[in-house]
């Protein structure tokens, strides 16, 4: 029984380490500074998607295919006025890439409210961040 509980808790911690979760104003700063679930000392790359219920169809769909990130979060702009104001979010979806808690790149939706970035573009930028940090 202990082995089953251990395996389930390990699976949950693994999924929480690389999944997509929701964040709010109250935990936003903690989450963008978050490190890997494995506790390594490598840089932390966190992606936050500012999301709106009315535009869910245009949200970034390939978050589970992005490689080299610590975590991917969504934040509902209707429930996060402070983060929305701080990062000057006007349209959803807007996607921000943070490295060690510092904003590296921002992709903003236009008037068409389409997702502002493709998987390939996002992956290329993440790879650039990782390459630049190796020196």
Segments (PLM) and residue ranges:
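Sec-dependent N-terminal signal peptides
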Residues: 4-13
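Sec/Tat signal peptide C-region and signal peptidase I cleavage site
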Residues: 15-19
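Local sequence-structure signature of Cys/Sec-based thiol-disulfide redox active-site neighborhoods
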Residues: 22-68
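Structural recognition of the beta-strand scaffold that forms the well-ordered cores
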Residues: 46-49, 94, 106
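Solvent-exposed loop/turn segments at secondary-structure junctions
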Residues: 53-56, 78-82, 103-104
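Structural alpha-beta junctions
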Residues: 66-81
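Structural micro-motif
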Residues: 87-99
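Non-catalytic, surface beta->alpha helical segment in thiol-disulfide oxidoreductase systems
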Residues: 97-135
